[in-house]
C-alpha cells in the first residue's frame, strides 16, 4: 500500500510533467512549422520530430482525460479514450524507432549497398515511414478494441455464475489474445529502435577508434564522444520508458491500483526527459529552448 503523501506527490508530479510535455510538443510543432514556412522544406529528421510533437501532444491530453475522467465515471465508459491513448503510445514508439533508423542511416559510416540506397532514397521514404507507423498502430490496437468489447459483455453477464463457461471463455480470450498481442505491438518498434541504436553505436565507436589511431584533432574526438553520450542518453531513457510501460501493462509484480499514480509519474517523467533530449538534438529546437528558458534579461 502506497502512503497517501506519496500518491499526492505523484499526482502533482504527473500534472507538472504533463504541462511540460504539452509545452514541449507545441514548441516543437511551432518552431519546425516556422522553419518549413521559411525554407519551404523540412529534413527527414525534422519531419519525424514534428510528427512526434503532434503525437506527444495528443498522447498527453488523452492520458490526462482518461486518468482524471475515470475518477468521476466508470472505467468502461472511457474505454474509447484508453484505446486512443494506446494508439498514440504505439505511434510514438514507431516514430521514435524511425527517428533512430534515420540517425543510423544518416550518421553511420557503413558502406553496405542497403545503407547507400537508403541514404539516397530516405527523403522520399519518410512520408511512407510515417504512413506505415499509422497503419501499424491501427493494427496494434485491434486486440484492445476486442478486449474492451469483451469486458463490456462481461458486465452484462454479471448475473451469471462466475464459473459460467461463456464468461470463462471470454476471460481466456482476453488474457491469451489481447495481452500478448499488445506486447508485440509495443515490442516490434522497440526492437527496430534497438537494432538501429546498436548499429549506429558500433559505427561511431569504430570511427572514434580510427580517429584516435590516426591522431585526429581533440575537437573531432570530443565531437564524436559528445555524439556517443547523446546516443547513450537517447537509448537509456527510451528503454526505461519501454520497460516501465511493459511493467504497468503486466501489473502482476505489484498492486497496480495503489501504485498507479507513481507509475504514471515515472512514465511521463521519462517521456519528458526523453523528449527534451530529442529537442536538444535539433539546432532550431535547441535554440528555441535556450531562448525560452535561458534568454538574457533585457538591459
From Swiss-Prot:
Membrane spanning stretches: 6-26, 48-68, 83-103, 126-146, 184-204, 234-254, 259-279
GO annotation, biological process: detection of chemical stimulus involved in sensory perception of bitter taste
Extracellular-facing ranges: 1-5, 69-82, 147-183, 255-258
GO molecular function: bitter taste receptor activity; G protein-coupled receptor activity
Cytoplasmic side: 27-47, 104-125, 205-233, 280-299
Superkingdom classification of source: Eukaryota
Subcellular location: Cell membrane
Cellular component per GO, a single term: trans-Golgi network
Keywords associated with the record: Cell membrane, G-protein coupled receptor, Glycoprotein, Membrane, Receptor, Sensory transduction, Taste, Transducer, Transmembrane, Transmembrane helix
InterPro entries linked to this entry: TAS2R
Keyword Transmembrane: yes
Membrane topology, record value: Multi-pass membrane protein
Annotated glycan sites: 163
Complexes and interactors: Interacts with RTP3 and RTP4.
Family annotation (PANTHER family): TASTE RECEPTOR TYPE 2, TASTE RECEPTOR TYPE 2 MEMBER 16
Misc. comment: Several bitter taste receptors are expressed in a single taste receptor cell.
Function summary: Gustducin-coupled receptor implicated in the perception of bitter compounds in the oral cavity and the gastrointestinal tract. Signals through PLCB2 and the calcium-regulated cation channel TRPM5.
Similarity annotation: Belongs to the G-protein coupled receptor T2R family.
Name of the protein: Taste receptor type 2 member 16
Originating organism: Mus musculus
Lineage: Eukaryota, Metazoa, Chordata, Craniata, Vertebrata
Amino acid at each position: 500500500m502506497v502512503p497517501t503523501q506519496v500518491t499526492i506527490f505523484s499526482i502533482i508530479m504527473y500534472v507538472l510533467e504533463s504541462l511540460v510535455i504539452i509545452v514541449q510538443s507545441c514548441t516543437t510543432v511551432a518552431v519546425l512549422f516556422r522553419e518549413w514556412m521559411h525554407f519551404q522544406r523540412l529534413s527527414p529528421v525534422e519531419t519525424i520530430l514534428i510528427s512526434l510533437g503532434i503525437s506527444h501532444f495528443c498522447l498527453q491530453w488523452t492520458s490526462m482525460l482518461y486518468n482524471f475522467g475515470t475518477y468521476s465515471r466508470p472505467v468502461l465508459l472511457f474505454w474509447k479514450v484508453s484505446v486512443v491513448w494506446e494508439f498514440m503510445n504505439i505511434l510514438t514508439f514507431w516514430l521514435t524507432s524511425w527517428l533512430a533508423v534515420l540517425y543510423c542511416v544518416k550518421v553511420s559510416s557503413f558502406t553496405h549497398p542497403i545503407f547507400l540506397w537508403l541514404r539516397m532514397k530516405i527523403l522520399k521514404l519518410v512520408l511512407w515511414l510515417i504512413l506505415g507507423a499509422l497503419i501499424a498502430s491501427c493494427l496494434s490496437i485491434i486486440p484492445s478494441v476486442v478486449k474492451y468489447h469483451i469486458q463490456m459483455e462481461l458486465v452484462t453477464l454479471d448475473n451469471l455464475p462466475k464459473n459460467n463457461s461463456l464468461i470463462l471463455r471470454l476471460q481466456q480470450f482476453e488474457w491469451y489474445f489481447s495481452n500478448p498481442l499488445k506486447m508485440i505491438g509495443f515490442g516490434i518498434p522497440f526492437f527496430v529502435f534497438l537494432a538501429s541504436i546498436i548499429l549506429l553505436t558500433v559505427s561511431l565507436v569504430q570511427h572514434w577508434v580510427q580517429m584516435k589511431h590516426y591522431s585526429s584533432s581533440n575537437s573531432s574526438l570530443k565531437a564524436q564522444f559528445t555524439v556517443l553520450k547523446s546516443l547513450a542518453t537517447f537509448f537509456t531513457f527510451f528503454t526505461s520508458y519501454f520497460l516501465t510501460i511493459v511493467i504497468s501493462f503486466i501489473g502482476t509484480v505489484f498492486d497496480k491500483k495503489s501504485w498507479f499514480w507513481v507509475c504514471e509519474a515515472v512514465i511521463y517523467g521519462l517521456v519528458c526527459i526523453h523528449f527534451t533530449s530529442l529537442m536538444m538534438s535539433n539546432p532550431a529546437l535547441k535554440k528555441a529552448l535556450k531562448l525560452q528558458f535561458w534568454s538574457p534579461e533585457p538591459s
